[in-house]
Amino acid sequence: MKKITPYLLLALLLTGCYRDQGNYDYTLDSMNEIKSVTFIPSVVMTAEGEVIEVQQALDEQSCTRRIEATVEQTLATDLDALEFYWCRSYVDEQGKAVKDTLRTKGYMEFVLPVGKAMSYGIFLQIYDRTTDLSHYASFKVNTRPIFKNSLFVLHGSEGERQVGNIEVIGGETKIYTDVKVVTRDNNHYENVSGLGYTTFMNIPDDLTQIGVTNTLLLYASHGETKAYDPHGMDVKYTAEQIFKPVSETFAYHRTIQTGDPSNYTQYKVVLTESGEVYVGNYVHALYKPGMACENSADLPHQSDYTITAATITHNRFLLWDAKHGRFLYSSKDDNGFAIDEGNSIKPSFISSSPLLDAHVRFDGLQHSPATMTAVMGYINYRDNYDQQNAYFIFRDDASGDYYRYELLKLDIGDGSKAPQRRGAAAEVSEPLAAYSIVSEKRLVGLTPTHMSTITYNAWFTTSNLFFAEGGTVYRYNVSNGDKFAVYEAPEGYEVTKIKFRAEESSSFSDDLGLYLNIVLTDGTHGAVAEIKFTTAADVDEDYPTLFYDRDDAGHRWGEIRDIQFVYDYIYKMIY
């Protein structure tokens, strides 16, 4: 035993002194690895997690869909050694919860019901037989209503107008010069002259029916104005259910809309070509101001006017009456406005706030706007800020110059009991003004080809306006007159209209107001371009300039009359 012990100690000592040479050969380079898996259609991140959106089925022929997986591997170039397990969970048309597994290699087919929503929960295992390792992915497949977050395009000559659409789904763009190719509806769009849109959380009398509602307004002559569900173009309301009251001579001119639908502070003004005016809130209904007001001898309701420009402040609609060269105003807090869709069609809801003369004085100005052409009105901040001032831009037709006037709201109460100014002999003189012009500025360098292209967006500072001259869109600095080209049209095109996806930020609108849609014409056919800005109003160089001059079948746009981006109420949560 004593002889063995020294040998054991020597062996242990030699083992402890062994030097690791580091010559291991694990042959990792010879093992295949799944580096990434991507899908067509592509996955987007939403509040639900990763989701693939597919357009809803419109007929039996479009019910079966397919998702394809693209697998990037380090060694293999095919899918021969891979096994796919598509584990699915969903509720079928009979309301039964279903779980199944498909083993199709590289793709998964699934079925959608016609015209209905559908959702699949997917857990994908890709097993590599050469390594005995697996790669996993988890996502949802949701149906996407047609024309969701898309641009509607009204084009063609009056009497032959069509409604088209540009829709981006993942990496695919679908373009239709006629939506009837998709919707197969029998609607008449021939006399439509303008587009409008509202979306909000509708809270009806029956609280079990609470939900988001979306309404696309197609303004038309001959009493043909209608409100549609944009996701299918089903008629929701007729002219008699929209206008309070209906105008027999209605011809759409433009819409001014401000506020946040998520907190029910959105309001709008709709102007006609003949100077009629309608006002309203976030619901689709439109009211002639003061139709049910109690008239006052001291503050008479004004009904003789030609309204050509307007803006919306914290608590008022502020309008320019070109017929009498004056400003008018009306309260937004109108008890006659319906606050849900169901009640909006009832005859009992009608505007009760009078339209009043603001008695704004021009005698201290170098250039009175009374004889000028009103171009537009806007506000210097979001409309729920009660200290904002209003701005109106006018064009002097004699000189071609543009002027901006800033209006300060004066504290004379709520407007219904404005005190009268009295002279020394206790005789009534001019009533107090509701607004005062506090600044007058000539806008040097503002040279639009069409003055209707002058645009303001509340996403940016009040020093920035946008306008088009020829084929160029400019950002214009009101403070110093500098202008900077932000878009150049292709040769042969002229810009006729510019319109942001949204003109004011809201809780769920994310970056909608940074996208500018541009309408162009070559004299015969129209086209649509899109650019994106940064929050500093610079062009976002990371966003490609988009240009659409024909649909997927090669059909060209006619002359484009109007465009309207239709977005989801919770757009921010979806994209």
Feature names for model-found ranges:
Residues 147-152, 214-216, 268, 388-392, ...:
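Entry beta-strands of beta-propeller and related beta-repeat scaffolds
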Residues 2-9:
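Sec-dependent signal peptide recognition
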Residues 18-179, 505-511, 521-575:
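Acidic/polar, low-complexity intrinsically disordered N-terminal segments immediately downstream
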Residues 452-531:
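Extended, charge-rich low-complexity regions and/or helical-solenoid scaffolds
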Residues 429-452, 482-509, 538-562:
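Conserved blade-ending motifs and adjacent loop-strand segments that build the rim/top face
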Residues 195, 207, 451-458, 498, ...:
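Hydrophobic core register within WD40 beta-propeller blades
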Residues 13-16:
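C-terminal motif of bacterial Sec signal peptides marking the signal peptidase cleavage site
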